[in-house]
């Protein structure tokens, strides 16, 4: 199997330890989360949700199934935003960057190995609830995670991830769920956090 064929959005990365925790306080009006002192607004989160719903609605006969499969889309998209911010902080601390060429090379590899750009985007929508306009962020994360793994070693990102979480001092609006330290997933409750995504499989031939 090629390394990009099974699309892994998330990073076994951070999140293999119940040691990671997040702050949860009183919800600030219009704020989904605060990361490193920067607000993630509910309007920005809703814009991402709307983009995904619009893409799902363009999926023809598959639209209803795609929508039904993402009942907690707000939580899922906030989770994705938080993961990306942590990856950015890890990369910043490590002195690593993702150039536009890096991102385009990553895109080409995924597109080539998944039967073309349309199939690649359809796979991300189906398995990762990502709209076409969100693909670049996915690719950037993949580039940075590859570089982080090269620097620290495969399976050794827990410590830099924990340091990034501490540095960012994340606060999350309780309406979006709770971080379950044992299950390492975002669930219903008071303390939302980052969830590990299911690894999407390659689309069937001819899909």
List where the protein language model places each region.
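Acidic/polar surface patches and capping/hinge elements
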Residues: 150-176
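Hydrophobic membrane-targeting alpha-helices
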Residues: 17-22, 90, 147, 151
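Short linear loop/turn motifs
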Residues: 103-108, 138-139, 174-181
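Proteostasis/folding factors centered on peptidyl-prolyl cis-trans isomerases
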Residues: 119-150, 154, 192-207
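Short, low-structural-confidence N-terminal segments
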Residues: 1-69, 166-207
